[in-house]
Structure formats: C-alpha cells, structure tokens
Amino acid sequence: PYLLSDPQVAADQLGIYGANVKIAVVMIMFTQAFRYAYEPFIFAKTKGEDKRTTYAMAMKYFVIVDLLIFLGVMFYLDIIRYFIDPRYFVGLRVVPIIMLAELFSGIFFNLSLWYKLTDRTQWGVYFSLIGLVIIVALNVLFVPKFGYIACAWAAFACYFVMMFLSWLVGQKYYPIHYDLKSIGKYLLLALVLYGIAVSVPIENMLLRLGFRTILLFIYLIYLIRHDLPLNQIPYLNKLIFKKQK
C-alpha cells in the first residue's frame, strides 16, 4: 500500500489482490500438504538404490496434479468466484498468474531436496535472497504504474527464477534425471486447453461450463493413457479383471 500515493486506492488494490489470492488457496493447500509428506519421504528413501528415480517420479506427478488443480479452478471460475465478494471480480485476471506462481513454488520445493541431501543448505538461503530481491524490485518498479497485477507477475517471476536456478545448480551437485519431456507435455497441454477455454466465447454459462468440462476430460484422458492406466488402480483392476473373465 505504501507504493501508491492515494491511500484509498492502495487499500482497494490490496483488497482486490488479497481476495483473489484466496481463490488459489486450493493449489496452495495441495502444495503445503505435499510439503508435509515429502520431506519425511525423501529422507526415508536416502538409502534406496532407486531413490533418484523415485524423486523424479514424485516431481512428475506433483506437476500433473497441480496442473489438474489449475485447470479445475480456471475452468469453473464462473462458480468458484462467488466465494469472494463480487466487488473483487475485477481482479480475477490475477488468479491464473498466482496459481502458476504457486506451481513454480511447489516445483522449487521439490528441487530443494538436492541441497538438503548433500548438506549444502546455504544454497537455499541464496535462492531465497535472489527471490526476495526480484519480488521487491519488481513490486517497487511496477506496482505504482500497474497496481496489483504487478504483484502477481512479481511472484510469478520470483518463483520461476528460484525454480530454474535450483534445478540448474542441483544438476551439478546432485543430478536427477527428471522427465522434463513428459512434464513439458503436460504443461503445454494444460496451457493450450486453458487458452482454448478463455478464447472461445460462449455466453451461456451452462454451455460454457460444459465445454470446459470436455476440455478437462481431455487432460484426464491424456493422463490415463500415458501415466495412470486404470488397470493399475486396485479397485478398478478387480472390476476389469472380472469383466475379462
């Protein structure tokens, strides 16, 4: 609020941004839950022979689920937005930016295992300081001109740079062969589906939600075909096996 000359405008901008951040809380909650479960898991796996493969798989499925949450929130934003005051609907454009920033934050946390396992935790401080400089600098430079939208892009840039640097340095000290090709395909698919959803004008809300549900199913079908065969799910496997008999 101190970056804007008019206190009332500053308060309004802060209220709009804060309200719309609440919409992204689903992804934030998933990331937090993952954090609580992941650290005990990685330290329990430090003696396993296939530990690096397991870490890579955990990263891949984290991104897959996070992108699913992203699509779910964005596709049904017509309904979810009513969890906040209609006065703040003007700020809904920051929601996808915030959610992608949170995705990068979660990936950064996944990547952080390399400096924890190799006892180079000072790198965590370095990355955090770099992120701090980026987010403060971008807010100071752009908030006075662009308002709350600059806050969202500052967070996006901050977490993206931290994520990239952690991956880059981590490959030197503790190389893990993440399935970047597969992760990239899911990210591209999610962004393309989101782009289609927002670029196709459908005035009727029910028809719009129906169309976006089809797009969400496309993502799920791709997931099932490539990384989550139904016959690998215990209960469904029994049903499939019975039918085959």
Where are these regions (language model features)?
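Membrane-proximal transmembrane or re-entrant/amphipathic helices at the cytosolic face
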Residues: 199-245
